[in-house]
């Protein structure tokens, strides 16, 4: 399968807890004043680490002692996502992890614990592909995530944040005082993903690429017959200096996005991240091919259990309106409580064209394929 890394700057905001000039450093070691949190199946041990200062070591545990299949809804339940600021989201990190009917992680527990590493078992980050899940760790001070394996989308979201991911043997080495070359954390990835991770995540990488501080690896595929999708990608390759590029299954490339869209559950973060990374004067190229929709939370304030979040939901709507006014993208806001339509359907009908490369924040974005677009 062709591996595509999208060239966007909308996934994460970067701020550093560690006193280093650049993250990640060339050599990775544990900070003397930070801690390691083990998410054990014995939840009382988790409580003792959070509230009683208990420190554990991987040498004294096995992978089987650790929680498997940690769901993103455990990390950031849907109600947590009504906040758009990752620093606020982090205050309710792991709010969905319950024991005997009450939260294991009280508000600010992960932030106040002084942790820089978090450790779990197999398949970390299953479930919904929400970016807020790794954000809740990142903005709690976590910079290294240890697991036996990761759910693919969650792994990509961590990578976009510049979070280093490793295994339990690497953690043993770190806890025994070893400094590990960052290449051991990044070496298993394709060349483009390595660049993103070694430059601190998607936002700083994109900024350095734009400023000419990062060179993309050459597209190495020789001239060959290509499928329709491969031709779409080859026509939009970055870093080929005007030359014709050929791609094949397994290549990792950067391709220029033609258009996209967002909805009120996610646009607030887009506006916040772009403003902080590029300044308040940032612009969106070709705004007629981008759009915002009010459809996901249209009826949320009429649902009794969401009533207490009404103010936060309105903030999400207001920030989407601010983004639209700032960028001039297409506006599909509701009028008198009536939405123009569902985002992935309206986008396909009105502005996705044949041959477009579309990126959007809705899980049904791939509907654009019905218009012979790569979405």
Describe the predicted segments one by one.
Residues 1-375:
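Fe-S-dependent hydro-lyases/dehydratases of central metabolism
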């Amino acid at each position: 399968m062709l591996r595509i890394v999208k060239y966007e700057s909308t996934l994460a905001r970067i701020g550093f807890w560690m006193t280093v000039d650049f993250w990640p450093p060339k050599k990775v070691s544990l900070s003397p004043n930070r801690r390691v949190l083990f998410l054990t199946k014995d939840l009382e041990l988790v409580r003792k680490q959070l509230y009683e200062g208990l420190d554990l070591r991987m040498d004294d545990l096995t992978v089987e002692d650790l929680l498997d299949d940690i769901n993103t809804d455990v990390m950031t339940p849907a109600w947590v996502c009504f906040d758009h600021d990752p620093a606020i989201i982090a205050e309710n990190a792991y709010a969905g992890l319950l024991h005997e009917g009450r939260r294991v992680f009280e508000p600010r527990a992960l932030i106040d614990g002084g942790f820089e590493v978090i450790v779990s078992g197999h398949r970390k980050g299953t479930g919904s592909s929400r970016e807020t899940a790794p954000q809740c760790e990142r903005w709690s001070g976590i910079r290294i995530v240890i697991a036996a394996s990761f759910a693919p989308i969650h792994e990509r979201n961590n990578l976009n944040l510049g979070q280093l991911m490793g295994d339990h043997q690497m953690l043993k080495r770190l806890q025994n005082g070893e400094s590990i070359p960052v290449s051991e954390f990044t070496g298993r990835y394709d060349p483009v993903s390595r660049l993103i991770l070694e430059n601190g995540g998607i936002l700083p990488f994109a900024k350095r690429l734009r400023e000419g501080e990062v060179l993309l690896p050459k597209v190495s595929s020789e001239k060959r017959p290509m499928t329709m999708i491969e031709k779409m990608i080859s026509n939009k390759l970055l870093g080929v200096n005007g030359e014709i590029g050929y791609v094949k299954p397994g290549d990792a490339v950067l391709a220029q996005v033609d258009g996209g869209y967002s909805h009120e559950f996610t646009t607030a973060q887009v506006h916040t991240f772009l403003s902080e990374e590029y300044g308040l004067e940032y612009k969106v190229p070709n705004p007629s091919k981008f759009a915002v929709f009010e459809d996901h939370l249209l009826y949320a304030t009429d649902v009794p259990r969401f009533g207490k979040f009404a103010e936060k939901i309105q903030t999400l709507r207001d920030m989407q309106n601010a983004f639209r006014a700032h960028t001039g993208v297409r506006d599909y806001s509701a009028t008198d409580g009536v939405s123009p339509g569902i985002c992935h359907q309206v986008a396909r009908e009105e502005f996705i064209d044949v041959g477009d490369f579309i990126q959007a924040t809705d899980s049904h974005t791939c509907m654009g394929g019905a218009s012979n677009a790569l979405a």
